[in-house]
A protein has these predicted regions:
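Short glycine/proline- and aromatic-enriched beta-strand/turn motifs that initiate or cap beta-hairpins
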Residues: 20-68
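Cleavable N-terminal export/targeting peptides
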Residues: 1-25
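Outer-membrane beta-barrel proteins
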Residues: 17, 21-22, 58-60, 83-89, ...
């Protein structure tokens, strides 16, 4: 993992926390698992993306997240992102996760790259789920992704 990845990740987390923190909005979640369903199912992707991460909600619309998982092409991916979800409908939040990740050899030879992921989140009192869509792009086959989360604070 490159130093640049961690510098960008820490700066993003600090800036997001300072810019949008609101009283009584702080929650800590542990994100586990991960499943994907690829639009192109003929490529024999791994769709059981085991992993673990943390997500810290700094406001009703914003959280920061970091973690690691076994990706669809059977490499380990590490990520750090700011999750901005300005659209709220009860316990459902909609928006985008913006961050850095690695572990995909077809993109910058497996190095660190910027990613944006449309994200819908449901959060109950103790359990939640993140639902994302990875769009089809040049070297990326799109997929639906699911990540489960447990509130610890």
């Amino acid at each position: 993992m490159s130093i640049r990845f961690w510098v960008v990740a820490v700066l993003a987390l600090c800036c997001a926390s300072a810019a949008v923190a609101e009283p009584n909005a702080h929650e800590l979640w542990v994100n586990v698992g991960g499943f994907s369903s690829h639009f192109n199912s003929s490529k024999n992707y791994n769709e059981n993306n085991a992993g673990i991460g943390v997500e810290y909600r700094v406001s009703p619309q914003t959280s920061v997240m970091a973690g690691s998982y076994y990706n669809s092409i059977r490499h380990t991916t590490t990520y750090a992102a700011v999750n901005w979800q300005p659209y709220l409908l009860g316990n459902v939040k909609m928006g985008v996760a913006l961050g850095m990740m690695d572990g995909y050899p077809s993109i910058v030879r497996g190095g660190t790259f910027f990613a944006a992921l449309p994200l819908v989140t449901y959060e109950g009192k103790k359990l939640g789920v993140n639902l994302g869509i990875i769009p089809d792009m040049a070297k990326v086959n799109g997929a639906f992704v699911v990540q489960f989360k447990f509130r610890v604070y």
